[in-house]
């Protein structure tokens, strides 16, 4: 697996680009990806390690914001039935961020969103590829302030939906055991 710096001007017009999202600010990476999807109609983008994306702000404030958004649309009888569905998993949260930056009523925006894949960690089908280039977004474009407060999407997910997070964590541990040579 090879890594390269992602530059919007030098992206291929067609094909697939794999972006490692580890340690990047979620909103800034989402704008970068939305712009690339709109400008290059033949390009497919795959984002891996979505759980390691960073949201700025105090952890308590960010988690409370997510919990409030989820609870204000739910009902006691059926919490998932009323109102818009608020994503809880990091991959779906990030895809929803990118969707908000695309023109969803225009055909170009709908097509662009279909060309985006977001994964929590790195899926096995990507690891098994022989010639895989994982792109890193340049840190100058996604700068993080020192001494600022940050929280990863995995930590938010752990507090908003602990049962799903526990299940994912157990599955990750099993995969790691399986991948280790005996």
Swiss-Prot record:
Pfam families: Ribosomal_L13 (PF00572)
Biological process according to GO: negative regulation of translation; translation
InterPro entries linked: Ribosomal_uL13 (IPR005822), Ribosomal_uL13_bac-type (IPR005823), Ribosomal_uL13_CS (IPR023563), Ribosomal_uL13_euk/arc (IPR005755), Ribosomal_uL13_sf (IPR036899)
GO molecular function annotation: mRNA binding; structural constituent of ribosome
Keyword Ribonucleoprotein: yes
Gene3D superfamilies the UniProt entry points to: Ribosomal protein L13
Kinase is among the record's keywords: no
Keywords attached to this entry: Ribonucleoprotein, Ribosomal protein
GO cellular component, one term: cytosolic large ribosomal subunit
Subunit composition and interactions: Part of the 50S ribosomal subunit.
Family per record: Belongs to the universal ribosomal protein uL13 family.
Chain's role: This protein is one of the early assembly proteins of the 50S ribosomal subunit, although it is not seen to bind rRNA by itself. It is important during the early stages of 50S assembly.
Name recorded for this polypeptide: Large ribosomal subunit protein uL13
Gene responsible for this protein: rpl13
